[in-house]
């Protein structure tokens, strides 16, 4: 069965690879990339990324390439069916959330509404 059929959120190879490199730079193998949603931004909700060395009991975790992506249950409900990717291009390098639940998205891609 494919990853997208079994998991509510996809963690791409390019995102996992970048997380692996960033964790190596920090020299703390216990770090995980936490993705979360908060109120704010020009569209009502915004995505956030942080490194965290804790996983809460009710967090959702995806492991790939020896690193973990962690999402709290409140944020996960807004991200089901989406993906976390990493891109390097003319506009810079960044983690990107593709969210099929977002009705509108801000031009910068970091804010959305449902």
Curated annotation (Swiss-Prot):
Signal sequence coordinates: none
One cellular component term from this protein's GO annotations in UniProt: cytosol
Cofactor: iron-sulfur cluster
PANTHER family: IRON-SULFUR CLUSTER ASSEMBLY 2 HOMOLOG, MITOCHONDRIAL
UniProt superkingdom: Bacteria
PROSITE patterns for this protein: HESB (PS01152)
GO biological-process terms attached to the record: iron-sulfur cluster assembly
Known role: Required for insertion of 4Fe-4S clusters for at least IspG.
Co-factor binding details: Binds 1 iron-sulfur cluster per subunit.
Organism encoding this protein: Sodalis glossinidius (strain morsitans)
Alphabetic keyword roster: Iron, Iron-sulfur, Metal-binding
Known partners and oligomeric status: Homodimer.
Family: Belongs to the HesB/IscA family.
Any single Pfam family the record assigns to this protein: Fe-S_biosyn
InterPro entries, per database record: FeS_biogenesis, FeS_cluster_insertion, FeS_cluster_insertion_CS, FeS_cluster_insertion_RrpA, HesB-like_dom_sf
Protein name, UniProt field: Iron-sulfur cluster insertion protein ErpA
GO molecular function, one term: 4 iron, 4 sulfur cluster binding
UniProt binding sites for iron-sulfur cluster: 42, 106, 108
């Amino acid at each position: 069965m494919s990853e997208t059929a079994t998991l509510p959120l996809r963690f791409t190879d390019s995102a996992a690879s970048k997380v692996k490199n960033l964790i190596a730079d920090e020299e703390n193998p216990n770090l995980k990339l936490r993705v979360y949603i908060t109120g704010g931004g020009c569209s009502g909700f915004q995505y956030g990324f942080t490194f965290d060395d804790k996983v809460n009991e009710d967090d959702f975790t995806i492991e790939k390439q020896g690193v973990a992506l962690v999402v709290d249950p409140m944020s996960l409900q807004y991200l089901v069916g989406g993906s976390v990717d990493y891109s390097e291009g003319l506009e810079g390098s960044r983690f990107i959330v593709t969210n099929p639940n977002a009705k509108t998205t801000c031009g910068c891609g970091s804010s959305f509404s449902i």
